Amino acid sequence: MEHAAPLAVPLGQAEVFQALQRLHMTIFSQSVSPCGKFLAAGNNYGQIAIFSLSAALSSEAKEESKKPVVVFHAHDGPVYSMVSTDRHLLSAGDGEVKGWLWAEILKKGCKELWRRQPPYRTSLEVPEINALLLVPKENSLILAGGDCQLHSMDLETGAFTRALRGHTDYIHCLALRERSPEVLSGGEDGAVRLWDLRIAKEVQTIEVYKHEECSRPHNGRWIGCLATDSDWMVCGGGPALTLWHLRSSTPTTVFPIRAPQKHVTFYQDLILSAGQGCCVNHWQLSGELKAQVPGSSPGLLSLSLNQQPAAPECKVLTASGNSCRVDVFTNLGYRAFSLSF
C-alpha cells in the first residue's frame, strides 16, 4: 500500500480544523450594509463574516480583499436568515433573533445590541427561524420558521405584537406586498398563505401542489422560495417554479426546470432563481430561459442584489450555498470572482 508523501510544512490542529470547517460549510444567508459597501454572510457554524465589497471590487483588489474584514460568532447554531435596517443587522438562528449595530461591527466590535425570543407555546421549544422580513410601513419585523407561525415584532419596542397561525408545518420563506401591506408565507405544508397585516388574518391560500401543472409528487409539496411583484407571485420548491396571478389564484407560467429551487427574486423584467445545481437561472416572464450562469457552489440557497443607491459602484448580485464561497456577479451574465470565509 502506498503512503502519501508527508507535507513539507505540518499543519497545526487549528489549521486542519479550519480547513475541515470550510470544506463542510454552508452559507445560508446574506445581507448588504445600509451604505452598500459591505456584505454580511451567515453560515451553518453560527458565524457571520463581513466582506468589503468596495475593496473586492476595487481596481487595486488583491486576494486578501476577497477575505472577510471581520468574522464573529453570532449564534450557537446556523444563521438561517439576515436583514439590514438603516442602522442594524438582524440575524436569526435557533429560537431567537439578534440585533447588531453595523457601525460597531465594522469597528470589529461584535457585541449584540439585543436578542429576542418569540413567545413559543412551550419552554422546551427551540424552533429554527428560517425567514426574516422587514415591514417598513409599520416599522416591524416578521419572523417565521419551525413553530409554523409568523411572529410580528415592533422594532422600536422589541415587543412581539401578534402571531399569525394557519400553516400546519414549518415555514420556509416570506415575501412582502408593500402597497397593502400584506405578507406571503410558504411552507412545508405546500401552501402559500397571504396575510393582511391590517386585520392580522389570512386572506388567501394557494395550495400549489394541488394544481396539476405545478405538482411534482416525487419532490414533495414543500414551498422553499417565493417572491412577489404587485399582483404577481413566483414560488417553487417541491412543486415546479411557477408564476402566479394572485388576484385570480391562477398559475400563468410554469418554468421548465427540474431541480427544486431554493431562492427566487424579481429583477427588472426578469426572474432570477437558484437551488440544486451551481447555476443562477435568468427567466423571462414568459417562461423562456434567458441564461444559466454557473457559480462555484454545488447548490445555492441565497441570492442577494445590492441596489443601495449610496454605492452604485458596488451594484452586484451575490450567490451563496453549499460551500465557503460567495460568488460575485458584477454583470449578471458571468461570475467575476468569489469571496471566501
UniProtKB/Swiss-Prot annotation:
InterPro entries in alphabetical order: THOC6 (IPR042626), WD40/YVTN_repeat-like_dom_sf (IPR015943), WD40_repeat_CS (IPR019775), WD40_repeat_dom_sf (IPR036322), WD40_rpt (IPR001680)
Biological process terms in GO annotation: apoptotic process; central nervous system development; mRNA export from nucleus; mRNA processing; RNA splicing
Subcellular location: Nucleus; Nucleus speckle
SUPFAM superfamilies: WD40 repeat-like
The keyword Transport appears for this protein: yes
Annotated Pfam families: WD40 (PF00400)
Keyword entries, A-Z: Apoptosis, Developmental protein, mRNA processing, mRNA splicing, mRNA transport, Nucleus, Phosphoprotein, Repeat, RNA-binding, Transport, WD repeat
In-chain residues carrying the UniProt-annotated modification Phosphoserine: 180
Superkingdom of source: Eukaryota
One term under GO cellular component: nuclear speck
WD repeat extents: 22-61, 74-112, 124-165, 166-205, 215-254, 256-293, 295-339
UniProt-recorded Gene Ontology molecular function terms: RNA binding
Subunit structure and binding partners: Component of the THO subcomplex, which is composed of THOC1, THOC2, THOC3, THOC5, THOC6 and THOC7. The THO subcomplex interacts with DDX39B to form the THO-DDX39B complex which multimerizes into a 28-subunit tetrameric assembly. Component of the transcription/export (TREX) complex at least composed of ALYREF/THOC4, DDX39B, SARNP/CIP29, CHTOP and the THO subcomplex; in the complex interacts with THOC5; together with THOC5 and THOC7, plays a key structural role in the oligomerization of the THO-DDX39B complex. TREX seems to have a dynamic structure involving ATP-dependent remodeling.
Protein's job: Component of the THO subcomplex of the TREX complex which is thought to couple mRNA transcription, processing and nuclear export, and which specifically associates with spliced mRNA and not with unspliced pre-mRNA. Plays a key structural role in the oligomerization of the THO-DDX39B complex.
Protein family (similarity comment): Belongs to the WD repeat THOC6 family.
Protein name in UniProt: THO complex subunit 6 homolog
Species: Mus musculus (Mouse)
Gene (name only): Thoc6
